[in-house]
């Protein structure tokens, strides 16, 4: 199988410069050992169909007709990252993996591979008793697509393989139309520009998970293989939550973000007796503006939000503050995003983070895909950060928490996780 790692003799290929949030994701990848590289896992039940790895290879190759991003790669040959079109053939991005025990093992295996300058597919071997299921991993640099865009590719791949007729298999799946970013902004989309966003960013967060110094973290927290937690709610619990949010005129994403902040206060604030005590949270708000964000440009709004809530604030009060801030972030002017990220990167190296508030990526309700039993998405967490993903698949809400191993106190992680999930359980009981 040809290597996807370019040799030093490869010619310098033409390409376009990175823009906006692409710059940020590539900076993290290049300067911080692949930080935020992504892996998406698809567990597919093929039923009585007798499929082989070769069937997946053919279907992957056919997707190159539909998704231009599959032939793109991030190149650093010129000294600055750029996106190169037509730089990859299907056979260069298809791999097979070994028999592994569970989904987390497949995630760990995928993150250890040098396959993050472009999109690639790994089909894992299965034992004889598991021939009815296939385990797939799509790996990608964040600059080439977000989780929802990669899910769209996985969906098209699965539908292609499971097509009932050869004619269906040969007909490429058309990607959904990609709306403009302006469709998600209001008529006041120029209200927020660089100055407003930098003022918000300077606010910072008053509390967060304390980051252990790298030089002492190994002594304080013994190295652990575990770096991720997952919880899945039942369809009934998920529907209860959806109806609750509708009744409160809130999105599920805003309500979940509020529960995260509420759980952080419960975890980290020992004395909440002062009625006037306030907490400030500043996090990056990155709402997806397209169901398919793999057209060669990342499609997130890199705008920080900041809210102030009392240490004894009720969950509903926090949720309303979050919803208001999300609305504010959506008015961040599109044409200043690139300048904002450029300036942000200049400041990035001069700031030493002391605490971490979990980033929150909500994919919403994903399309039902025939045969898709399970799905996971992760981002490499080798910076001293914490991150949360949320998605609903097959009417079940899935929540994950990931963290950089040995950079946070285990008791903080454990208490936050149990408090957060426990709060949601109480509401949907």
Swiss-Prot record:
It is an enzyme of class 2 (transferase). It comes from the Eukaryota. Pathway: Secondary metabolite biosynthesis. GO terms for molecular function: transferase activity. Keywords: Transferase. Its EC number is 2.3.1.-. InterPro entries: CAT-like_dom_sf. Induction: Expression is strongly induced under conditions of nitrogen starvation. Expression is positively regulated by the cluster-specific transcription factor rua1 that recognizes and binds to the specific 5'-T/G-G/T-C-G-C-A-T-A/T-C/T-C/T-G/A-3' upstream activating sequence found in all promoters of the UA biosynthesis genes. Belongs to the alcohol acetyltransferase FCK4 family. Probable alcohol acetyltransferase; part of the gene cluster that mediates the biosynthesis of the glycolipid biosurfactant ustilagic acid (UA). UA is a secreted cellobiose glycolipid that is toxic for many microorganisms and confers biocontrol activity to U.maydis. UA consists of 15,16-dihydroxypalmitic or 2,15,16-trihydroxypalmitic acid, which is O-glycosidically linked to cellobiose at its terminal hydroxyl group. In addition, the cellobiose moiety is acetylated and acylated with a short-chain hydroxy fatty acid. This is Probable alcohol acetyltransferase orf1. The lineage of its organism: Eukaryota, Fungi, Dikarya, Basidiomycota, Ustilaginomycotina.
